[in-house]
Amino acid sequence: DLQNAIHADYGKHPSETDITEIYPCIAEINHTISHLRKWMKPKRVGTPLALFGTRSELRFEPRGLVLILSPWNYPFNLLINPLVAAMSAGNCCILKPSSKVPHTSKFLKTFISSLFDEGEVALFEGSSAISNDLLKLPFDHIFFTGSPKIGKEVMAAAAQHLATVTLELGGKSPAIIDQTADIRKTAERLMWGKFINAGQTCVAPDFALIHQSKLAEFLKESRAILMSRF
């Protein structure tokens, strides 16, 4: 199953897989089901005076064929959540998981095949060469999660076909701690956010900007929390 596949790829604990991979996808699916009818509804917009007597509205239509390229650090979450969004908008999808998670990719191949016809959703396993070949094809939209370096290559490939792109390229996440902070609670939450998934999270806190008067206490509490957990 998924827990075993992810553990085989990089040792992730089953409980952590539940918390960071499965539950977020269930929440995304439920949120989409609850709001999709409202999202699909056409929106009235203003009409230019030159077109007086007419009615204007925005209608939401599928892009067409979507390519989703997912990373290794959250191989289920960061593949399925974009898939939920793309399919709920009426698109067909091609999926390419990271080559660094072969066991998870194999699980996903079986999982996706059991749910969808290949004409609706198809998943390709394999090396980065497969991704490069896919990027040569005329997709209507490309969703990529990964590094800025590869993101530039994805954007350049998309430009050849005037495809739109969604690029999630990570970033820096500072924590700002002032003199009013509850240091015990702050340290506990920051250590959880920093070390979940062994720190391999795009929004994990990278550094803290802390009031000088709270620095010693913060370091003490952080060390104690890490020692108790690891």
Regions found by a protein language model. Give the residues of each.
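A structured beta-alpha segment of the ubiquitous adenosine-cofactor-binding alpha/beta core
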Residues: R55-E57, L123-D140
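ALDH superfamily catalytic-core signature
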Residues: F116, K149-F230
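A glycine-rich helix N-cap at a beta->alpha junction
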Residues: D117-L123
